[in-house]
């Protein structure tokens, strides 16, 4: 009994230590990401509010830092949860995190779906390369022919909006929608095509969002892997936490049928985190 009790105590201590180490690593990595992306935004707003002349350090933002931070932290959380064993080979892990086609626009890969493709043997396939190059060509068409041409109209209309009437402003809005679509969809096609040439199938990240039938359906089609990352690593842990359960009971007790505030609060928290993952701008 004594040995069993001691073993349980050691196991509990190890579990607690693992929890704190995981939390520390998450805090440090997301803290670095926030500091790099928000330092100029914070300095500008402090100067605006208080009339100061504070200047932030001039640092270059590492290429793709958001994507490989989210991807590596998702891996860390999965290992902590025991979903799979950690890969102790640093070079294999570096390959998983920094696979070059997905650095700029994603998708945010999951270790269990991507690692086996990266580490396995790949044979030469002319058909696969042709398919990948065709997809890349289609992506460049969206970017160069659609997005860049629409950007000319957008820049002119919104750069000199005082000179244009309602119909032309509406045309500028429509062209901006085309520009966004061409930039993101075209970029994803190039990424998927380049990966296909290497025999790697990445997760779908963009699925005809302008054909969505509702706002919810739209968000399930646009930047899909970021949405699923937020769902798995933010929404569910946040929703099932003790604090949110207590808040839910409080809402039901004091608001009755209006306890939906609890549900909307969870979605607001996730959408806030999702918006903060992009570069901030002051309107």
Locations of regions flagged by a protein language model:
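Membrane-embedded transmembrane alpha-helical bundles that form the catalytic cores
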Residues: 1-283
């Amino acid at each position: 009994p004594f040995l069993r009790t001691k073993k349980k105590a050691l196991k509990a201590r190890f579990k607690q230590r693992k929890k704190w180490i995981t939390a520390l690593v998450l805090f440090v990595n997301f803290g670095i990401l926030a500091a790099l992306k928000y330092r100029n935004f914070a300095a500008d707003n402090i100067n605006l509010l208080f009339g100061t002349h504070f200047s932030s350090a001039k640092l270059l933002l590492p290429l793709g830092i958001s994507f490989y931070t989210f991807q590596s932290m998702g891996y860390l959380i999965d290992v902590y949860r025991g979903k799979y064993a950690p890969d102790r080979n640093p070079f294999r892990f570096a390959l998983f995190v920094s696979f070059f086609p997905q650095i700029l626009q994603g998708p945010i890969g999951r270790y269990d779906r991507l690692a086996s493709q990266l580490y396995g043997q790949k044979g030469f396939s002319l058909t696969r390369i042709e398919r990948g190059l065709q997809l890349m060509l289609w992506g460049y068409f969206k970017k160069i022919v659609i997005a860049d041409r629409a950007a000319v109209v957008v820049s002119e209309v919104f750069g000199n909006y005082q000179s244009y009437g309602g119909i032309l402003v509406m045309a500028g809005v429509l062209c901006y929608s085309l520009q966004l679509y061409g930039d993101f969809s075209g970029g994803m096609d190039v990424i998927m095509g380049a990966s296909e040439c290497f025999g790697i199938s990445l997760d779908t990240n963009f699925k005809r969002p302008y054909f969505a039938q509702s706002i919810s359906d739209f968000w399930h089609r646009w930047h899909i892997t970021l949405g699923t990352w937020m769902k798995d690593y933010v929404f569910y842990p946040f929703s099932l936490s003790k604090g949110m359960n207590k808040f839910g009971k409080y809402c039901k007790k004091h608001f009755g049928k209006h306890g939906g505030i609890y549900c909307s609060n969870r979605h607001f928290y996730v959408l806030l985190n999702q918006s903060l993952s992009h570069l901030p701008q002051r309107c």
